[in-house]
């Protein structure tokens, strides 16, 4: 398969951060990353622009690192309760989304739903979850699903 170099405009999970030069399959770049505004094609001139983006991202990361440490202290080890409709057998109607978890966490700290990692929740119970607050800092917490 053919690959192509691109420069990321925004952070993409499991791929890289803004300003990173990555090599991906041509179809992924052409059909998804570039049209959705996540990336642009790599050129020699664009490589300099990528370096500027990377420097700006690093400066912002240093400023937000302190905030991420404070947020981790608040979130780490806590549990958030989410109320959901369930069938008589205890199975959820639908599932629990990252947006619902982020909204429940918003009472304590505002987080990006894209940074939340949790297994697929289909039943009542308590589930471990992780939220990325910063590229180097993440916090572990629990999602407790309770019947309405």
Curated annotation (Swiss-Prot):
GO terms for molecular function: rRNA binding; structural constituent of ribosome. One of its GO terms (biological process) is translation. Keywords: Ribonucleoprotein, Ribosomal protein, RNA-binding, rRNA-binding. One of its GO terms (cellular component) is ribosome. Belongs to the bacterial ribosomal protein bL9 family. Binds to the 23S rRNA. This is Large ribosomal subunit protein bL9. The gene is rplI.
């Amino acid at each position: 398969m053919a690959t192509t170099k691109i420069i990321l405009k925004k952070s993409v999970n499991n791929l890289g951060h803004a300003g990173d030069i990555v090599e991906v399959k041509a179809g992924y770049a052409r059909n998804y990353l570039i049209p959705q505004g996540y990336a642009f094609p790599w050129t020699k001139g664009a490589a300099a622009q990528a370096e500027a983006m990377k420097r700006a991202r690093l400066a912002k990361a240093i400023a937000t690192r302190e905030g991420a440490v404070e947020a981790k202290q608040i979130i780490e080890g806590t549990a958030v309760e989410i109320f959901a409709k369930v069938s008589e057998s205890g199975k959820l109607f639908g599932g629990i989304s990252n947006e619902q978890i982020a909204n429940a966490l918003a009472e304590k700290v505002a987080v990006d739903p894209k940074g939340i990692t949790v297994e697929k929740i289909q039943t009542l119970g308590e589930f471990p979850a992780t939220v990325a607050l910063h590229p180097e800092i993440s916090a572990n917490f629990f999602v407790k699903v309770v019947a309405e």
